């Protein structure tokens, strides 16, 4: 067992990996476990994890790597995949794939996944070594485009840059994949590759003025500011933090600093990764203003612009916060990538606050949106989840579908162990999500046994590896859906007084081998209106959004082909 605490939050475990980092950083209120210390046990989440392994292994890595080999002037071993992988966004799934393999290997120890990870990383290294200057990217004819950028020729649009399809967004996936291979899967060579690629970007943009940089950032660019901040934390070099600032989009940041909602009409998932970067930079610099800006964005999106499943946006854009009519009627409802990124932002915010309200949102979005975006039979992923009553979703297929939400989907179901538990030092353990799982924590093992949400509660069993007692406080999250005074607690079958503080049931004692705590959390039926108060209600039981069984007629294209718009439900709008 290796316990790697996370001083910085998010996906990362940077403080434990870099205890001598030169950068001052915000002290977290809670710390996260290495995902390899957590194992899922039998549940819908474990099934989703298993299905994701099958999907990952069904993909041909040489086809995903083909754009990278072409970019390095090497002969590909196979043709590109179709769909978005050969129509301009070539290589974006390769970066997601590297991240997903890293998380899945850490989460399961699956040896075939580990071998696949090492192969993909070695081929990417071959491409980077051949390039000779740190470059690693699958953007078609990318060298020509990047040379134009280096020379100050910037032609930016929302979904394009110098006649390419969002190349900054594309290369961000490679940065994130290398970061995750290093920090999550502990592949040391990925660190060197990540730094070389960052140095290349620094040189490429060195001569651009601040005005040119901000103009370029009009083009969707993922979370490049976050990844450059990560490199700063990994290396302790403030030079990379300056680069992170250069890649921070001021037209989004400035209204947030003023606590202003200027989101209506803009592409939703373009903005969320930027805000993750603002928060990441804030934590490294102890910048309270940027942290408040990120929290304001979260509050605005969650409270004013999201529906009960935790998703947001219609046709990929933020609609007016006072009019959810398009949400109710469109076949292009909340996008999976948006919620994927909102959960990543939530993780950062929770770590520096330990405020359970963040976990209430996390639970709702994870159970109702993310888990449901995987076909439980064939493992395909969903792009849009329509809120139109009686409509349907479209599922990806491994050999035909390579949208952005396939990339985030590959990652989603490998990451369920991230937020189940947290700790503060060696004497505070937090149980945040009620998902059957085990945790290795120093000299003790924790088992969480539950069939939640079919069961209105959860049990925690403590096992001592050395047979010795351990004194610590066990903190069980009190969900917002539990009525005041209804939660009850037993230890080894004996009813105990419930002590609630800061959103948690707190049980401080010397725990011995075999101790079993059970928390009962009664659930109730309730109705929640849309944020525009239009009297369009969802019914929930506890945190679970309910749905009625309806007809299955005319669900055209439920399993996507390789067409450019194959992710959109093409059938008639029913009813």
Segments and roles (model prediction):
Residues 24-575:
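Glycan-recognition and catalytic cores of secretory/periplasmic carbohydrate-active enzymes
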Residues 1-26:
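Bacterial Sec-dependent N-terminal signal peptides
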């Amino acid at each position: 067992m290796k316990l790697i605490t996370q001083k910085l939050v998010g996906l990362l475990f940077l403080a434990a990996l870099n205890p001598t980092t030169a950068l001052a950083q915000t002290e977290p209120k809670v710390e996260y476990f290495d995902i390899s210390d957590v194992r899922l046990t039998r549940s819908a989440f474990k099934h989703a994890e298993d299905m994701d392994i099958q999907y990952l292994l069904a993909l041909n890595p040489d086809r995903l790597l083909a754009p990278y080999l072409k970019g390095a002037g090497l002969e590909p071993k196979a043709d590109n995949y179709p769909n978005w992988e050969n129509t301009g966004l070539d290589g974006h799934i390769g970066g997601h794939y590297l991240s997903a393999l890293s998380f899945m290997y850490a989460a399961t120890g699956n040896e075939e996944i580990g071998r696949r990870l090492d192969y993909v990383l070695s081929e990417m290294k071959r491409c980077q070594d051949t390039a000779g200057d740190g470059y690693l990217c699958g953007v078609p004819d990318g060298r020509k485009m990047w040379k134009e950028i280096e020379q100050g020729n910037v032609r930016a649009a929302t979904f394009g840059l110098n006649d390419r399809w969002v190349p900054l967004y594309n290369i961000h996936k490679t940065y994130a994949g290398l970061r995750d291979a290093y920090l999550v899967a502990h592949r040391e060579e990925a660190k060197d590759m990540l730094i070389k690629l960052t140095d290349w970007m620094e040189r490429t943009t060195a001569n651009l003025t601040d005005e040119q940089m901000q103009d370029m950032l009009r083009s969707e660019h993922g979370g490049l500011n976050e990844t450059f901040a990560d490199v700063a934390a990994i290396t302790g070099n403030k030079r990379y933090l300056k680069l992170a600032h250069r890649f921070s989009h001021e037209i989004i940041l400035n209204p947030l600093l003023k606590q202003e909602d200027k989101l209506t009409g803009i592409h939703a998932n373009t903005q969320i990764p930027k805000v993750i970067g603002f928060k990441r930079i804030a934590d490294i610099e102890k910048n309270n203003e940027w942290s408040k800006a990120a929290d304001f964005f979260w509050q605005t999106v969650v409270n004013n612009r999201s529906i009960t499943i935790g998703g947001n946006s219609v046709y990929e854009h933020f609609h007016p916060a006072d009019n959810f009519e398009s949400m109710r009627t469109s076949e292009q409802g909340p996008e999976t990538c948006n919620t994927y990124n909102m959960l990543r932002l939530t993780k950062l915010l929770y770590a520096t606050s330990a405020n359970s309200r963040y976990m209430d949102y996390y639970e709702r979005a994870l159970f109702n949106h993310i888990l449901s975006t995987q076909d439980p039979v064939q493992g395909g992923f969903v792009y849009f989840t329509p809120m139109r009553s009686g409509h349907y979703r479209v599922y990806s297929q491994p050999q035909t579908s390579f949208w952005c939400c396939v990339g985030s989907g590959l990652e989603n179901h490998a990451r369920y162990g991230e937020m189940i538990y947290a700790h503060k030092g060696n004497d505070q353990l937090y149980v945040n999500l009620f998902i059957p799982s085990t945790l290795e924590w120093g000299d003790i093992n924790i088992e969480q046994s539950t069939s939640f949400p079919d069961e209105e509660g959860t049990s925690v069993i403590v096992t001592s590896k050395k047979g010795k007692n351990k004194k610590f406080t066990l903190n069980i999250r009190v969900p917002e859906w539990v009525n005041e005074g209804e939660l009850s607690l037993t230890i080894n079958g004996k009813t105990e007084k419930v002590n609630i503080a800061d959103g948690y049931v707190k049980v401080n004692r010397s725990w011995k081998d075999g101790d079993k705590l059970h928390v009962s959390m009664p659930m109730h039926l309730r109705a929640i209106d849309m944020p525009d108060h239009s009297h369009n209600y969802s019914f929930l039981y506890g945190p679970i959004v309910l749905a009625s069984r309806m007809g299955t007629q005319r669900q055209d294209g439920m399993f996507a082909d390789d067409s450019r718009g194959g992710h959109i439900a093409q059938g008639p709008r029913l009813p």
